[in-house]
């Protein structure tokens, strides 16, 4: 077995974000405002179930404990349940999560659970149905809310909800969000709006630092929790009067990258060392046969030697990320 993935800055990597499609049926203003547009034609299409099985097996041999399936919208894959099961085959992977817009959650969550899914993140940027429609381009607010209820009914102890923090859109709705999570085991994660190649104007108009919310939470008696090694980048806060939690993801904060523990593989098999990195390292030619696993592990480990210390977002560097559906956010 190869050694634990570690980069030149002594960061260890336990967490893989694996995109399985860049297709999405929502048109969120901060991601795909004009809807999904196919990229360059790729005869191989998106990663197959067997390719997913091989790449996650290689990462697990290198110490990966958590795999998050992302998109686009991953549940648009007809074989999504089989993909979950393929990852679940590997006992070294302790957590299998999905980030979803939630529109198929009510219908399919029990099947996903039975296939091996252990955690769910749902994107909800407003608790007002009309504003939700305006942000996403889809009139599916109640369907998504029913999906979250279905996840709890299916036995998920906690559901994470991702909310992109936007000035003059939802930043003033903190009290509404807090009332929603008070009786529910929801970890509500406010994510700072990030500048992408296609979203510079939106960023200038709507970016708000998560520190504004952080200061308000601390003022109200919320307590900062200690981060676990396979956790994502959120700073998590709890309060004795609330069943739910608040998470803040602030990529522009000083030292945000110091605790990076995650790598990304795109839906066409490229390894991305950073959400805002350049190019990517092609792994797909080593996902063809089971016998290539040692070579695949070696290429992943070698690529990690090139991971930079920080994303340089502060300098306005958005890398190749034209929109966040490209490599799964």
From Swiss-Prot:
Q: Which Pfam families does its entry note?
A: Fer4_12, Mob_synth_C, Radical_SAM
EC code(s) of this entry? 4.1.99.22
Required cofactors, per record? [4Fe-4S] cluster
GO MF annotation list: 4 iron, 4 sulfur cluster binding; cyclic pyranopterin monophosphate synthase activity; GTP 3',8'-cyclase activity; GTP binding; metal ion binding; S-adenosyl-L-methionine binding
From which domain of life does this come?
Bacteria
Which residues are involved in binding [4Fe-4S] cluster 2? 257, 260, 274
Identify the Gene3D superfamilies for this entry.
Answer: Aldolase class I
Annotated residues for binding of [4Fe-4S] cluster 1: 24, 28, 31
Q: Which reaction does it catalyse?
A: GTP + AH2 + S-adenosyl-L-methionine = (8S)-3',8-cyclo-7,8-dihydroguanosine 5'-triphosphate + 5'-deoxyadenosine + L-methionine + A + H(+)
Say which enzyme class the record assigns.
Answer: lyase
For the Radical SAM core domain, which residue ranges apply?
Answer: 8-234
Query: Which key words tag this protein in UniProt?
Result: 4Fe-4S, GTP-binding, Iron, Iron-sulfur, Lyase, Metal-binding, Molybdenum cofactor biosynthesis, Nucleotide-binding, S-adenosyl-L-methionine
Name the positions where GTP binds.
Answer: 17, 68, 99, 160, 262-264
For this chain's record, the cofactor binding note is:
Binds 2 [4Fe-4S] clusters. Binds 1 [4Fe-4S] cluster coordinated with 3 cysteines and an exchangeable S-adenosyl-L-methionine and 1 [4Fe-4S] cluster coordinated with 3 cysteines and the GTP-derived substrate.
Could you tell me which pathway this protein works in? Cofactor biosynthesis; molybdopterin biosynthesis
Any one Gene Ontology BP term: Mo-molybdopterin cofactor biosynthetic process
Q: Kindly list the residue ranges recorded as spanning the membrane.
A: none
State the similarity comment: Belongs to the radical SAM superfamily. MoaA family.
Q: Which HAMAP family match?
A: MoaA_B (MF_01225_B)
Question: Which PANTHER family does UniProt cross-reference here?
Answer: GTP 3',8-CYCLASE, MOLYBDOPTERIN COFACTOR SYNTHESIS PROTEIN A
The name this protein goes by in its record: GTP 3',8-cyclase
């Amino acid at each position: 077995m190869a050694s634990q993935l570690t980069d030149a800055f002594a960061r260890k990597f336990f967490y893989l974000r694996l995109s399985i499609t860049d297709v999405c049926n929502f048109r969120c203003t901060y991601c795909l405002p004009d809807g999904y547009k196919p990229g360059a034609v790729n005869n191989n299409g998106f990663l197959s179930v067997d390719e997913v099985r091989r790449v996650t097996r290689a990462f697990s041999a290198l110490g990966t404990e958590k795999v998050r399936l992302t998109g686009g919208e991953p549940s648009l894959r007809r074989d999504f349940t089989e993909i979950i099961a393929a990852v679940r085959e590997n006992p070294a992977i302790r957590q299998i999560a999905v980030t979803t817009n939630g529109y198929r959650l009510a219908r399919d969550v029990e099947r996903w659970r039975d296939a091996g899914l252990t955690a769910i993140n749902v994107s909800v940027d407003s608790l007002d149905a009309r504003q939700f429609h305006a942000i996403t381009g889809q009139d599916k607010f109640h369907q998504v809310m029913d999906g979250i209820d279905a996840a709890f009914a299916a036995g998920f102890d906690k559901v994470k909800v991702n909310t992109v923090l936007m000035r003059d859109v939802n930043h003033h709705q903190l009290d509404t969000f807090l009332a929603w999570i008070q009786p529910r085991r929801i970890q509500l994660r406010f994510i700072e709006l990030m500048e992408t190649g296609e979203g510079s104007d939106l960023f200038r108009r709507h970016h708000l630092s998560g520190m504004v919310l952080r200061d308000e939470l601390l003022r109200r008696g919320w307590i900062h929790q200690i981060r676990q090694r396979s956790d994502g980048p959120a700073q998590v806060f709890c309060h004795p009067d609330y069943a739910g939690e608040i998470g803040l993801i602030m990529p522009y904060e000083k030292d945000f990258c110091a605790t990076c523990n995650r790598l990304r593989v795109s839906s066409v098999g490229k390894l991305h060392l950073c959400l805002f990195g350049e190019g990517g390292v092609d792994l797909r030619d080593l996902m063809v046969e089971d016998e290539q696993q040692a070579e695949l592990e070696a290429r992943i480990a070698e690529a990690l030697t090139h991971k930079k210390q920080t994303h340089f977002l502060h300098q306005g560097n958005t890398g190749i990320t034209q929109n966040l559906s490209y490599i799964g956010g």
